Amino acid sequence: MGKTFLAQKLMEKLHYPYLSLDHLKMMFIRGRLTDLTVEDDYEMRYFLWPYATELIKTAIENEQNMIVEGCYIPSEWREQFTEEYLKDIRCFFITMSEDYLRKNFDSVKSNGSVIENRMEEEVDLERLINCSKEFKKEAEENNIPVIDITDHYDINEIIEKALKIISL
């Protein structure tokens, strides 16, 4: 959904490093540190999150900025942090409407590796639609701002929306 591309653009604009949770996932899979596979998205979310949480806490303790991106951020992410940390964290989700995905599936699929060279994996339209709907629902239930792509994908517009959400 353009998460890594957005993180890359924000890194270039803000000069903040970013952590792709996909990279963390692949470290565990390739290092045989988990039996989970690239298809185990839901389980992977809860496997990775404790590690990501500690990385985020360490960055905050060292007064360092960091962008964390990926679909492995659980909607109840706040539960892992005390107020001391929460005051320094900004979070938003990116979703794509069903209509947008159906009309632009080929483009979404072909641009999925614009930043990362990914292993060949079959992109499933219905899975993308369901994941996007679920993320949007979870975000609404947990008061997480959403950037919902509904009619066109303009990275500059998305960057501006992201900067407003994080108040920079």
Model-derived segments and their meaning:
Residues T4:
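Walker A/P-loop
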Residues E43-F93:
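Glycine-rich phosphate-binding loop used to anchor ATP phosphates in small-molecule kinases
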Residues Y18, D88-F93, V146-D148:
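Conserved beta-strand scaffold positions in the cores of enzyme catalytic domains, especially
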Residues D88-E134:
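A glycine- and Lys/Arg-enriched "phosphate-lid" helix/loop adjacent to the NTP-binding pocket
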Residues M1:
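ATP-binding Walker
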Residues L24-M26, I73-P74, M96-R102, Y153:
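Conserved nucleotide-binding/hydrolysis micro-motifs of P-loop NTPases
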Residues K133-L168:
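NTP-dependent small-molecule kinase module
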Residues Q8-Y51:
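Conserved substrate/cofactor phosphate-moiety recognition/catalytic segment
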